[in-house]
Amino acid sequence: MEVKTANKCYITDTKGNTYIDTSMGSGSQIIGHNNALIREVGEQIKRGTIYTIPNCHTGKVNSYLKEHINPDLDGQYIFCNSGTEANMRAIRLARAYTGKSLVGRFHGGWHGGLDGFLEEHSDNKGIPSDTNSLFRVLTYNDDQCFDKITPDMAAVIVEPVQGSNPRSDIQQFLQKLRDHCTKTRVLLIFDEVMTGFRLSAKGGAGVFNVRPDIVTYGKVLGGGFPIGAVGGKAEIMKTKNVFYGGTFSANPLSMCAAKLILETIIGMKHIQYDKLHDIGKLFRDELNKFFIAEDKKMRVVGCGPLNRIIFTDRFIRNRKDRDNFEPENAQEMFSGRLKEL
């Protein structure tokens, strides 16, 4: 299958077949394909696509993020080209600020293609074994993980809601994580690449009322264009001699799209988060009714508009439970059934 065009929530392939797009650019197209905002970016193309020096959109994007999205994080934002790059820069910043190298991350989390994030991934060939010594893997949604978060660590990075295990009952765990990181003087990084501007205008931090020291964004922020962003407390963001550069970082097209998407979110002209949460819940409820009625060992778990099919009817707390309860060939079975349709 090859996609030829996309409009609103639909994609059309080269044979003229039209489908509902349940991925929406892996979550980046929250206001739909071929929307009016993206057409405005076309005007920016006529004015130039890359200048190397700062463009007229970047300052506004920075101000919108600081004033309307994360007023608690008062430092200047750093912009790059993807969520992966944003997380790489956030880790580098945390290490530079603290003078420590060890970073905690959670099993089942996804922070992009950095070598140190891929230990558990099946496609992890070519990664030096000593890379993993700089990271400590923790168990998500399990209080025992706090014993492994120690003062010799620079930071802990976490998705407020994991894509592999999206759940709405996570506030208490996140607050305990926040408190423990404060106690041990370990920086807390929220990877909001997936949750930012999808769970709410203020992402997972806003929904669960837990504040990180550093935050990263991507996906929705670019409105369909490549983007990443790192923000944090001013004291942290002012750390000197940290390299963040990149040829296409903060390019006019991505920053124009980010400015337009933030203006839409701030004004709530099109995006209604309550409705998104209601639709997400309806999707889960109806599919779970079907799975129960058909006696299928499958369930849909989720938080707001974020949903995940799991191949077990047992309650899971984290990705570790999924690994224990799901059949080893669950994904292959699912792919096979899709091909039969």
Predicted regions and their residues:
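Conserved N-terminal phosphate-binding loop of PLP-dependent enzymes in the Aspartate aminotransferase
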Residues: 1-341
